Amino acid sequence: MNMFNAHIPSYLVPKNLNSNWNVGFILGILLILQILSGLLLTFFYVPCKEGAFESLSRLVTETQFGWFVRLYHSVGVSFYFFFMFIHIIKGMWYSSKYMPWSWYSGIVILILSIVIAFTGYVLPDGQMSFWGATVISNLLEWFGKAKVITFGGFTVGPETLKRFFILHFVLPAVVLVIVLLHLYFLHREGSSNPLTLAEAVALLKFYQLILFSDVKFLVIISMFIGPQVGYGIWTLFQADNDNSILSSSENTPAHIIPEWYLLLFYATLKVFPTKVSGLVAMVVVLKLLIILVESRSKSQAVSTAHHHRVWTTTSVPLVPALFLLGCIGRMVINLDLIIIGIYGVLLSTTFVQKLLDSSRVRA
């Protein structure tokens, strides 16, 4: 209880926090809701080729409020990643890279969340899910037995659904443990604030004022989640229409489009000519976020010129460059898009390298 009291209600935070610091709380609540809705779905889902698609169809049409649980679990992951990307951008903007263990644990949460989302994307056994999994399975041909171990065979089949179901069930528990570590490292080093990473003089307890601010923000977000679940207002957060069709290995979709939060990594696979080069590019994009923490200067974090921040000419274009790659992931690929995509990857790596160089100069 003393540890809980020290890390939650009695935890001291800077007095000048703004709404950007509500996002971490929102992410925790969304993660818990995803786990709870997923547990409810496990009572009805059948992880086999013959029953996966049909079991979810029966859940939506024949079970009371089954449609709500199914759609919330599908839509909730989009909101989860939306706020996670905002949380990452906020960390870059407000120099959270100066808290390396919090940054590293956050990146691990991101990577595991991507794996969980992809395995969950495959489980409904829809047309787009099947062919999306086929694309990834083809990439693993270079890893020999890793492909058979992961997919249960040389192609996507019944064993794939069973293994992905186990991963999708177990990995969220791992994420919860890392989230606790993330909170521990954050509270050990102290929260950042909009002005500086130096220890703030004006502090207040997390409970009541800050907690009520988080809850107020959560209520506002729920006003967007409800209409999205019921009416699908934002098409970007909705699944592709082809995923409402039972998968068929004989009919290939005209254009494979994964969920929007996977578009950045899918684009890096599309714009490079070979599987190996595309896979390397995808790893490089993830590596960019990891090595950002190495751009922290050894000098004091306080600077009236804000040199400790990343809003310099070499780093601000990083987010638009990655956003451009995500847009390419939704388009039918052609030579022009390939050139633009390759330039986007090169520009992103250049921006991060410049950021590292400038930090060495300042240090």
From Swiss-Prot:
The keyword Metal-binding applies. A ubiquinone binds at residue 187. It is a multi-pass membrane protein. Binds 2 heme b groups non-covalently. Gene3D superfamilies: Cytochrome Bc1 Complex, Chain C (1.20.810.10). Heme b b562 binds at residues 73, 168. The chain crosses the membrane at residues 23-43, 67-89, 102-122, 164-184, 210-230, 271-291, 309-329, 332-352. It holds the Pfam family Cytochrome_B. PANTHER family: CYTOCHROME B. The main subunits of complex b-c1 are: cytochrome b, cytochrome c1 and the Rieske protein. This is Cytochrome b.
